[in-house]
A protein has these predicted regions:
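N-terminal Rossmann-like NAD(P)+-binding subdomain of aldehyde/semialdehyde dehydrogenases
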Residues: 1-100, 128, 269, 474-496
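Structural signal for hydrophobic packing residues in well-ordered secondary-structure cores
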Residues: 12, 16-19, 23, 35-46, ...
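Rossmann-like NAD(P) dinucleotide-binding subdomain of oxidoreductase/dehydrogenase enzymes
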Residues: 87-230
Length: 496
């Protein structure tokens, strides 16, 4: 065993002891107060600003004022979601079905968290874990270590007021390493990964139950029925928030040609600047230098972004983001992928159907399962996208990054981790929320038997194949004659 592995093992020992004490007696009030203590640690205005300032200083990503808003809004929304939720003991009782559901803690949860949201994402995981009676150990990105450490200090200060053990919320100490993260993944009861797709893959291969979320590459359609002015305003607000650190920030816009000129004018009024071919090539060359995103351009203010690219544009003083003309999609056109910067790629299509085809092409290149957006007055088109595109979310007439992770004016749970289903190689297709932080035990009692006849279940099939079947000789099964569960052998049931 290496020293780094031993360090993680020591965290696990302390976490398991603290979690056992915390969960003893299954006290809902204790869980609720602990969750609120963690929430107040990040939401208290002075601490929030300190964390936000530290986040930008340490990671070089985003904007302080927007991180303050994000930390507050995301945490307040989560508290709203879980405010009256029962997360321990009996959470559902259905006498008609003879079922009683009991919420149980998972135990010790590990969470690998990104540098893009070094306070908000850990806080969300911590609150959900505590709400459900768990301990949690964080593995922050190297750039986010100091922010995470400050957050935990604030949480522990709140814990002291309630007499809670600090070991309920811990972190892998600096310096971060792949060895430490791997040991954590292999040792906890559940591992949650937000951010690096390499870490997501490693989590799924660790042998531990894992929840990983997929890559973003949010792509949005503006069709010919859209309120173009409103669409441009929402897209600009979402694209520029926190300098596009969100995985839900728009990366590509697909516009139906009929409203292109009107949309570009509206986008210009919101600070979007369509680049000519020369400037666009200069931005792409700089942004994707060496085959990967340029860290000197991602999540930077627009003046820094343009300076690194060596580009000057008209009305630069009022510019908020740039628009790159798009044509191709795929590895040879990196602008069709996630950019994590104040650059938006614009595709133009003749009609809605070809726009849908373009979105599908983009998602199959990157971002499958995450989300698509639609600005339209035709709600049937939203349903069409949901039925036909490889996506877990269709965001309709909303600022994408404010909607995908939950909003006070939509029904999604507040989260910073969006599951992308099988399309994105994930085990969940929903926003990460409190239900993912608990086990459920089901008590199953006998109820009056409800066994259909063969006529009840096969009549429509027999009609469809044009055959008349005599089922009069069918066998009625007594409870003791039922076929065993398919994972148990006949030999094993013989001895029940």
């Amino acid at each position: 065993m290496t020293a780094e592995e031993a360090e993680v093992d020591a965290l696990l020992v302390r976490a398991r002891i603290a979690q056992a004490r915390y969960a003893a007696g299954a006290d809902q009030q204790r869980f609720d107060l602990a969750a609120k203590a963690a929430a107040w640690a990040i939401m208290e205005p002075h601490r929030n600003r300190l964390l936000s300032t530290q986040a930008v200083a340490q990671t070089g990503l985003g904007r302080v004022s927007d991180k303050v808003i994000k930390n507050h809004r995301k945490t307040l929304g989560l508290l709203r979601d879980i405010q009256s939720v029962k997360s321990v003991g009996v959470i559902r009782d259905d006498p008609d079905k003879g079922l009683t559901e009991i919420a149980r803690p998972i135990g010790v949860i590990g969470a690998v968290v990104p540098s893009t949201n070094p306070a908000a994402t850990p806080a969300n995981n911590i609150i959900n874990a505590l709400k459900c009676g768990n301990a949690i150990i964080l593995s922050p990105s190297p750039k986010g270590v100091d922010v995470c450490q400050s957050l935990l200090a604030f949480i522990h200060a709140e814990f002291d007021k309630l007499g809670l053990e600090h070991d309920l919320v811990q972190m892998v100490a600096s310096p971060s390493s792949k060895i430490k993260t791997q040991r954590l993944m292999e040792s906890v009861d559940l591992i949650i990964v937000t951010g690096s797709q390499d870490n997501v893959r490693r989590a799924y291969e660790s042998g531990t139950p894992a929840i990983g979320v997929g890559a973003g590459n949010a792509t949005v359609i503006v069709d010919e029925t859209a309120d173009v002015s409103a669409a441009a305003e929402k897209i600009a607000a979402s694209k520029t928030f926190d300098n596009a650190t969100s995985c839900s920030s728009e990366n590509a816009i697909v516009v139906v040609r009929e409203v292109l000129d009107e949309f570009l004018q509206a986008l210009h009024e919101q600070g979007g600047r369509l680049l000519d071919a020369t400037a666009s090539e200069a931005v792409k060359s700089a942004l994707f230098s060496g085959g990967h995103l340029n860290r000197h351009m991602i999540a930077k203010d627009i003046d820094v972004f343009l300076d690194v690219a060596g580009v000057q544009i008209a009305d630069q003083g009022t510019a908020k983001f740039v628009v790159l003309p798009g044509d191709s999609v795929g590895a040879s056109a990196p602008e069709s992928g996630e950019k994590l910067s104040l650059a938006l790629t614009l595709y133009v299509c003749d009609d809605f159907d070809t726009a849908v085809d373009k979105v599908r092409e983009i998602l199959m290149h990157q971002g499958a399962g995450h989300s698509v957006g639609l600005h339209s007055r035709n709600d049937e088109r939203a349903l069409s996208l949901g039925l036909n595109l490889p996506t877990c979310r269709v965001i309709v007439n909303q600022a994408h990054c404010f909607a995908t992770g939950g909003s006070f004016d939509n029904g999604l749970p507040f989260s910073l981790s969006m599951g992308c289903g099988s399309w994105g190689g994930n085990s969940i297709d929903s926003n990460l929320h409190y239900r993912h932080f608990m086990n459920i035990t089901r008590i199953v009692r006998p109820i009056p038997a409800v066994q259909p006849s063969l006529e009840d279940v096969f009549a429509d099939y027999w009609r469809a194949i044009g055959e008349r079947v005599d089922a009069s000789g069918s066998i009625g099964l007594s409870p003791t004659d039922q076929a065993p569960d398919d994972h148990r052998s006949a030999e094993s049931t013989h001895h029940d």
